[in-house]
Amino acid sequence: MSAHATGANPFADTEDQAALRQLARDVADRELAPMARHGDETEEFPQWAWDGMRKAELFGITIGERWGGAGLGDVEAAIVLEELARADVSSAILAQLIFNGPPRAIEHLGNDTMKDRWLPIAASGEGLFCIGISETEAGSAVGHMRARLRPDGDGFRLNAYKNYVTGGHKARACLVWCRFPDSAGTKGIGAVVVDLEAPGVTVAGTHVKMGLRATSEAELAFDDVRVEPDDVLLWGDPANSESFKTLISHINHERCGNAAMCVGAAQGALEYAVNYMNERKLGDRTLADLQGLQWKIADMATQLEGARLLLQRAVHMAGPHGTPPALETAMAKTAANLAAKFVCDEAIQLLGGYGFSREYPVERVYRDIRGLCIGAGTVEIQRNFVGTSVLRGATPASDGWKSRRA
């Protein structure tokens, strides 16, 4: 995944991955970067980015060949998301929703009818997909959700109000987490796929945000929406939490994508700061000649590369068609979120007043990163999981983590 991977690096891009990286970088530089400021200022859906990614046939990389995709895995998804986010995080999120969102869940967990209906639409870029999990009183505490199915003949009726649905105002279909009949807590939580053109679905509003402004967060209302048996992605058994655990496990794809976007965005901010320091004159010297500022760059680069390596390990452990392991994924997302926030904050400081100005991209990247630190499970949620896992004896894949308990 590293742009400078050579020699014995176990995570070096293959020839095909290097070509994919270059394709994504070309799309990012040509289609995303020139319009990133416009999307941020106007909050306009980045149709230019969508069209550019669709023309380059990027949307289908993680979808099976049977449905028009390339059948690649988390490594390739991370490569593309890193390069796209280096130019514009808001636009990269559109690809994230296809690579690691509902289409991937549909392919892994759905029935054949569902796959044949939705996956060609995703692979071709014909339609956007979104996921409805959060509610007013159920964000990180998913077990408090109120979205519920009730029996209706041979199918169901869905009643739900979902909050912070990324891309919900433009999506064709939504993967909705909900309670199946007679369930409580995390028991009986499953998921259905809803056509957003179905009767009873309304976009109830959108949020005005600090960052990620070109990608809206919608509020979606589902009022007695008919759900056919073939629309059920994962049945929620009220006797146990197995379906909930399966859904949570699937979010590891999204968390790795989140980490990849953080790495890419931070890389862009670091490169901008380095270029500025090499050009900014102080008499006969540049900012790059000052030792104290060199240390800042050293810390930025070191934290960024550490996060990149944790991400690379997590996605490589997933294999071509598996799921990234939970502990390594949580570590990667935590490290990438914190590193990106640190790098962007320091980049603003290095640019001084220019860094604080909207005429320059670094402040926008910082605002976008703050959103990524919340989405797909907050940093605090990841830390909770890592901390409790280690205390209970779980260890990451590194050989140095051998239990020495008696």
Task: Outline where the language-model segments fall.
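Alpha-helical interface subdomain recognition
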Residues: 1-91, 97, 109-114, 121, ...
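Helix-loop "lid/cap" segments that line or gate small-molecule binding pockets
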Residues: 100-108
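A short, Trp-centered hydrophobic/proline-enriched beta-strand micro-motif
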Residues: 125-133
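Conserved hydrophobic/aromatic beta-strand scaffold that supports enzyme active sites
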Residues: 130, 144-148, 173-177, 191-193, ...
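Short Gly/Pro-enriched turn/cap motifs at secondary-structure boundaries
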Residues: 137-140, 164-167, 180-183, 209-216
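Flexible, small-/acidic-enriched active-site or ligand-binding loops
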Residues: 144, 197-228
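A short core secondary-structure module
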Residues: 159-203
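Long, acidic (Asp/Glu-rich), low-complexity accessory segments flanking structured domains
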Residues: 224-245
